[in-house]
């Protein structure tokens, strides 16, 4: 593209052109360009900015002049008139393109027509100056802390400072208002803090106005993946081991209650979404979230989202969770428990509904303190309804790369009648030196030996069969990784096949692919 060549001529040192940034993973020194699409290229540099960040420079086609854009907008408004725009975003884009094609035929422009169309659609339909970051699949998070540069977290290079910059409050406020309106949750001075979803599904938090955000309005975007990360990808990334995944598979087969816990940005929702593929296919699932992130492969899936109106029409997680109990679900999945809906979740467990959720807690002690304290206030006698607590964290490896690891999986057994403490057993622990998940092995799982064995009618002499089954499930998942079966829905299909054929036959089948 000519605009990329124009950019390159202004550089003192020509960067390397690469197809995939992953080839530079672990590199301390880099200067490269990669393509996002025909109109967006990214130049990444290890040259530190004054605030210590590596550089992320967006390369886009030049914009038409301000006067040209004003004229185009006026003509567009006249052309579209009172036409009702289509609901579907892609159909809207088609309509805009067809109108612009006619308008631009009769205009003399300072830039090529396709550049004008790109910028018009980028600004009017999508996310404006942030759109290149939304389109880049290697970005995890986007942060506008106020006036100044936009920052990102890159999947390969970690935190970076972008070339996108806001220099006045009006420009920044206009973006925040525009994006919140496109998210159908508009900000205002009466409602300055809003959680919403962008048109592509990414989760966004808006804080509007200099009166509450001293450096100007701010936003944080957590990028959304259209196809969820699969359990085999998490095994390949090292987030969890195949044995740990096999253990979770076994537990979800038996309707166990499970929380995925960790700090912010530790990958809790990603893991929760990945393990939903282990829930038996013939069960009814209800997902309850503030912003829609969970994607469940099951056909009998009810997806519910809260509604914030600031008045009587507000629907909170608490309301949806109470309603879900009347919908006869087999599994209830809550995007994140943080308030009194946690109490309802434990009542659901008490009445025989299986529940999974994410939760902010770094360890079992913090988990219990938060669950039993204000505002959740779960009675301690209810805590053992939660069978499994999985703890995940984000950390840096020896090369300085950001990685995510499940560092402990605890089985919650009971409440000690003397000390009133929660009794639990760590089923898996993490060895940070070897970067390995350690399974305590045969005889170590209370849930396998005292719940699953009893449920299946297996006597204590034959409990070893359940551990053998764990090994087979682990082997099956390892084979999927070896065969590079990573697509979320493909993995789901192979798990269904294993259910139909039996594990032994499924292992033979995958081995011969």
Curated annotation (Swiss-Prot):
Family: Belongs to the GSP E family.
Annotated positions binding ADP: 239, 265, 267-270
Taxonomic lineage from the root: Archaea, Thermoproteota, Thermoprotei, Sulfolobales, Sulfolobaceae
Domain notes for this protein: Contains a variable N-terminal domain (NTD) and a conserved C-terminal ATPase domain (CTD), connected by a flexible linker. Both NTD and CTD form similarly sized globular structures. The NTD is essential for archaellum formation, motility and FlaI localization, but not for ATPase activity. ATP binding induces a conformational change and locks the hexamer into a more symmetrical and less dynamic conformation, which may promote hexamer assembly by stabilizing interactions across adjacent subunits.
Organism the protein comes from: Sulfolobus acidocaldarius (strain ATCC 33909 / DSM 639 / JCM 8929 / NBRC 15157 / NCIMB 11770)
Catalytic activity of the protein: ATP + H2O = ADP + phosphate + H(+)
Effect of residue 69 to E: Significantly reduces localization to the membrane
Compartment annotation: Archaeal flagellum; Cell membrane
Broad class of where this protein is predominantly found: other
Protein name: Archaeal flagellar ATPase motor FlaI
Keyword Isomerase: no
